[in-house]
């Protein structure tokens, strides 16, 4: 599903609004994923504390949202822009690519919770399309 110019503009606009809370969004989304989808904990078994609000969860949530921000800056070429990150997850971390969609869903849930007035149905559609394209780009090296 390709992103229209309107989708790209909407994603950039909502990112401008939410980016000051990106670290909080990332930490909450990761904590939700680890709670709701406990099978994802296997990728983080080296962390001593996987509980919501723990240092490792907050730190990785910040990393995740930093990557989302980077993806938005490369929105016209997600596959090329995220090639190194795709390679890392495919060959070194060996993350099942299905987890990209799981995490994306949780990020969307948190954005909707924290920004209910801004997260209109139109924004939801564009953000959902963006995260689907992001997940596909991150899955590129798995093929």
Swiss-Prot record:
PROSITE patterns: GLOBIN. GO terms for cellular component: haptoglobin-hemoglobin complex; hemoglobin complex. The modification N-acetylserine is found at residue 2. Red blood cells. It holds the Pfam family Globin. It comes from the Eukaryota. Residues 2-143 form the Globin domain. One of its GO terms (biological process) is hydrogen peroxide catabolic process. Keywords: Acetylation, Heme, Iron, Metal-binding, Oxygen transport, Transport. The keyword Cell membrane does not apply. The keyword Membrane does not apply. O2 binds at residue 60. InterPro entries: Globin, Globin-like_sf, Globin/Proto, Hemoglobin_a-typ, Hemoglobin_oxygen_transport, Hemoglobin_pi. GO terms for molecular function: heme binding; iron ion binding; oxygen binding; oxygen carrier activity. Heme b binds at residue 89. Involved in oxygen transport from gills to the various peripheral tissues. Belongs to the globin family. Heterotetramer of two alpha chains and two beta chains. This is Hemoglobin subunit alpha. It comes from Danio rerio.
């Amino acid at each position: 599903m390709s992103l229209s110019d309107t989708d790209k503009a909407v994603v950039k606009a909502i990112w401008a609004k939410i980016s000051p809370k990106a670290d909080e969004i990332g930490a909450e989304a990761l904590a939700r994923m680890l709670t709701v989808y406990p099978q994802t904990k296997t990728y983080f078994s080296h962390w001593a504390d996987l509980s919501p609000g723990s240092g490792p969860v907050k730190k990785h949530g910040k990393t995740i949202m930093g990557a989302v921000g980077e993806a938005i800056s490369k929105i016209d070429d997600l596959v090329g822009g995220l090639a190194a990150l795709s390679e890392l997850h495919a060959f070194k971390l060996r993350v099942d690519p299905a987890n990209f969609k799981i995490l994306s869903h949780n990020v969307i849930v948190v954005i909707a919770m924290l920004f209910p007035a801004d997260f209109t149905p139109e924004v939801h559609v564009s953000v959902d399309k963006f995260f689907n394209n992001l997940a596909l780009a991150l899955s590129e090296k798995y093929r």
